[in-house]
Regions:
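Conserved class I S-adenosyl-L-methionine
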Residues: 1-35, 46-50, 67-70, 74, 126-157, 187-191, ...
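Short catalytic micro-motifs in class I SAM-dependent methyltransferases
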Residues: 102-105
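Conserved Class I S-adenosyl-L-methionine
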Residues: 175-261
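Short alpha-helix
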Residues: 154-170, 176
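A conserved beta-strand element that flanks and buttresses the S-adenosyl-L-methionine
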Residues: 99
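A short glycine-rich, Lys/Arg-flanked "PGG" loop and its adjoining helix->strand segment in the class I
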Residues: 111-124
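Class I SAM-dependent methyltransferase SAM/SAH-binding core
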Residues: 38-40, 44-87
Length: 261
């Protein structure tokens, strides 16, 4: 995840905790005031801060010094740590819940990360917000940035792979909830412009999205933006968006349980 050193600068210009996503994470975490919680791959701490408003003692870890540095400037009420998810600096059963948003595709191997998260959890839920390759293949962005979207989808572990790694670590009772991007989404991650295609014409927005800043070539961005701009002006974009409509959600909440031992 040290690759986020490359996009950390200016990250908070377009990335912020979305209230609806926070509400769904809270729903499954079931935060209690006297317990401790961990945000894994917390980035600049946007979701950590938002979730901490519900109570509890919060910790956030990230592998990027730039991201953790930005998080530390936002709050000294949260315990921020520069750390690798496969070697967490905590004792066993330290946390009553763990959350991770849009980061598990950087956990290599996935099993090592989930084993560590299981180790530091007491009874509680591990709540993930992610997308699957199947969902990403349904993004209309593939019409304009096919190679970058293909690479991004290939990075994502399938739901089957995630569930196998979770059960292998000891978690059980896995459940999922699909999330479809809404027009008022405040966190400008990859498919946040689903209903607002002109958003992708903004270089600042693209800079905060790893698919564009880390995977897409300059030529693909220039060509894709040119085609997208033309389709927005002619109205063809509406037909493109309709072609990619589906009911499988754009992202997914995955919830796994650990019982008291």
């Amino acid at each position: 995840m040290a690759i986020y050193e490359r996009i950390g600068k200016g990250y908070d210009l377009t990335r912020r905790a979305d209230p609806y996503i926070v509400s769904r994470l809270n729903h499954y975490l079931k935060v209690r005031a006297n317990l401790s919680y961990l945000d894994v791959a917390c980035g600049t701490g946007n979701y950590t801060l938002a979730l901490s408003q519900s109570g509890g003692t919060w910790h956030g870890i990230d592998q990027s010094p730039r991201m953790i540095g930005a998080a530390r400037k936002k709050s000294d009420a949260i315990f921020w740590q520069l750390a690798d998810v496969t070697r967490l600096p905590y004792r066993e059963r330290a946390f009553s819940g763990v959350v991770c948003t849009l980061a598990i595709h950087y956990f290599i191997p996935l099993s090592s990360a989930f084993n560590e998260i299981y180790r530091v959890m007491a009874a509680g839920n591990f709540v993930l917000f992610t997308s699957t390759p199947e969902q990403m293949n349904g993004y209309w962005l593939a019409e304009y940035f096919p190679e970058a979207l293909h690479q991004a989808a290939e990075q994502m572990p399938s739901l089957e792979v995630v569930n196998d790694a979770l059960s292998g670590a000891g978690f059980h009772s896995m459940q999922t909830e699909n999330y479809s991007v809404q027009e008022d989404l405040q966190d400008l991650f990859l498919y946040s412009g689903k209903h607002r295609p002109a958003m992708y014409m903004d270089a600042a927005v693209r800079a905060g999205i790893s698919t564009f800043s880390l995977l897409a070539s300059t030529t693909e961005i220039e060509d894709g933006c040119g085609k997208l701009d033309s389709d927005i002006k002619t109205g063809r974009i509406k037909d493109v968006i309709r072609k990619y409509e589906h009911d499988e959600g754009d992202y997914k909440l995955i919830i796994a349980r650990k019982d008291a031992t």
